[in-house]
């Protein structure tokens, strides 16, 4: 009988393991409107499927999993473009946003992007196979220029616009040029998997998007800082040059992609 119960325990254990594996390999359906609490799936490798509305022109895109370039093309067409914010310039309340092409590297989890779509306005099926879920309630990248702190944010859930926090997004009527404008409480705010910009240090900012180029001043600034003794990592250790990720330069956090 002891041997029988031991075998039963082994069988039960194997069944539980198999059930867990089946649950993790089953396609995970995510909401692109209200959002999905993906914390319960954090670290799991899953097949992911979701339905996302897109419009001809520039859209925004941020998801809690990675996608290959091939999966991106399968969803949005081979003519789609994928760009991320790489630098900013500030002149008074005028802020220039510099976006660069990163499509060749695919989609990285919790990274805010601009997505250019050449098809007709519709809802498309987005799928990714065996991708790792990475939970992040507030994905964002921060850039600093003069007194302007510009943050490019991803919406992990539906975020309503309010009077307290100025949030800037791309309306469909403005998406030919990726024009970021103030989103008012009268609108629906930002649905999950979309992106928006917030700004500190500048009142009533206006934005101009640039694609496929970087400002000369930003390039020179990076080169100059590479020889500076004022570059540290987040642990306070001095660096010989600016590294990828978050650096502390002259007391300010600077993101390098």
Model-derived regions, located:
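Sec/Tat signal peptide C-region and signal peptidase I cleavage site
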Residues: 17-23
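Bacterial N-terminal signal peptides that target proteins for export
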Residues: 1-11
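A short, polar beta-strand/turn micro-motif
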Residues: 24-76, 101-179, 183-217, 255
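C-terminal outer-membrane/trafficking sorting elements
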Residues: 215-257
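N-terminal low-complexity, intrinsically disordered segments
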Residues: 80-102, 108
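Acidic surface patches and DE-rich sequence motifs
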Residues: 89, 173, 198-199, 233, ...
